[in-house]
Amino acid sequence: MAVVTLSEMMEAGAHFGHQTRRWNPKMSRYIYCARNGVHIIDLVKTAVCMNNAYKWTRSAARSGKRFLFVGTKKQASEVVALEAARCGAAYVNQRWLGGMLTNWTTMKARIDRLKDLERMESSGAIAMRPKKEGAVLRRELERLQKYLGGLKTMRRLPDVVVLVDQRRESNAVLEARKLDIPLVSMLDTNCDPDLCEVPIPCNDDAVRSVQLVLGRLADAINEGRHGSNEQRGGDDYEG
């Protein structure tokens, strides 16, 4: 059975690429045609890539690999958090901070600081501090939760990075490649397929397209880990 059908992808608008003047020629192998100045992605090839991505991701999950979902643009942010949580993956959905991967020791210290502040807040320790000091600590807590909240279960570097928008997340791409971490990437017509190990050519701007692709990848991770794609707890990433 196909992981995703042509009709599902059509309904999600997965076939709409960017304006023809904004394309990357390396994506030509995945482009069906140009219509009204917009490239149309070949969904038959997308379906093949989705099948490959599903199998690859399921196999990686089965062997105990840890995943990081990355998508910081507005239309992807909520989906990234929901689907990552559903399959027990870590995620970044607000802003990629330089060194999230390449300066992991420092980033891990900031995550530990976040956990400490959360414990202080839940125990009432912050409320017991002088008003000004408590306000400073709460602002720090809010900032860390916003940018690092999705990484709290990540005790070490991920084995796989799943990307929504390759061009927007160029810093994440550079860091992952520097550390030889494989990338599973949604690729719009302005992307470079040579910069990822597992390409998924599709519209990376439409919410429904992002939901469809990330939903299937989360299913693959759950199936690889648990033998089914049902939702499980989010503690599988730790260890």
Curated annotation (Swiss-Prot):
Signal peptide: none annotated. Keywords: Ribonucleoprotein, Ribosomal protein. Pfam families: Ribosomal_S2. CDD domains: RPS2 (cd01425). Belongs to the universal ribosomal protein uS2 family. PANTHER family: 30S RIBOSOMAL PROTEIN S2 PROKARYOTIC AND ORGANELLAR, SMALL RIBOSOMAL SUBUNIT PROTEIN US2M. It comes from the Bacteria. GO terms for biological process: translation. One of its GO terms (cellular component) is cytosolic small ribosomal subunit. InterPro entries: Ribosomal_uS2, Ribosomal_uS2_bac/mit/plastid, Ribosomal_uS2_CS, Ribosomal_uS2_flav_dom_sf. GO terms for molecular function: structural constituent of ribosome. This is Small ribosomal subunit protein uS2.
